[in-house]
């Protein structure tokens, strides 16, 4: 049983098949498919319409590979359940991104998949995706947001009223770092966030 979770499609459930085919992997709808129903699609040869033999030859998280062979016309094909993005199965990245961006607990989400017997990524895969891909994506979007904000302020030549807030434990506690946030009080938007050592708060 497979699941493909789309964190960007809560309000886009009205795509036709043709429309969905032209979308990027993260924009496409994903569906819950039972293994028995999936294998029914590989019972007939697409070349000569004879009965074929098919089996799941590889599983990587939520992605699987199926080999279909026809003894009548010797046709063989390999089918993948999802596209690859940067050498990684798109569904696996979507699951990790959905967990992180929704603020969910990865241990609980992945445990739910196991209880449902849904093919899914491991916790170590989620951590790797988070470290090497998702954090970088967040930083990229954040920097673009900051550039757009500064450009807009310059274009309209408006004055800006800024307010700051810092959070950190008091000396003697375990926290080594704290955060400083800067807010545009007129627009109600965060302008900047900086991670600083706790000792800087008291110097």
Q: Whereabouts are the PLM-identified features?
A:
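Intrinsically disordered, low-complexity linker/tail regions enriched in polar/charged residues
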Residues: 26-30
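RNase H-like nuclease fold core
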Residues: 1-23, 36-43, 47-51, 61-90, ...
């Amino acid at each position: 049983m497979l699941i493909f979770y789309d964190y960007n499609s809560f309000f886009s459930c009205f795509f036709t098949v043709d429309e969905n085919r032209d979308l990027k992997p993260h924009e496409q709808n994903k569906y819950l498919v039972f293994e028995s129903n999936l294998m029914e699609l590989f019972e007939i040869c697409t070349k000569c319409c004879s009965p074929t033999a098919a089996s799941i030859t590889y599983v990587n998280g939520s992605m699987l590979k199926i080999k279909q062979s026809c003894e009548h016309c010797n046709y063989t094909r390999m089918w993948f359940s999802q596209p690859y993005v940067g050498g990684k199965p798109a569904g696996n990245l979507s699951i990790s991104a959905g967990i992180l961006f929704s603020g969910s607990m990865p241990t609980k989400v992945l445990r739910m998949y196991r209880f449902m017997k849904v093919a899914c990524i491991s916790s170590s895969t989620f951590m790797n995706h988070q470290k090497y891909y998702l954090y970088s994506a967040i930083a990229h979007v954040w920097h673009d947001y900051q550039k757009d904000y500064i450009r807009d302020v310059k274009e309209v030549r408006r004055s800006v009223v800024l307010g700051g807030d810092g959070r950190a434990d008091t000396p003697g506690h375990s926290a080594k770092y704290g955060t400083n946030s800067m807010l545009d009080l007129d627009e109600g938007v965060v302008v900047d966030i900086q991670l600083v050592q706790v000792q800087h708060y008291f110097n």
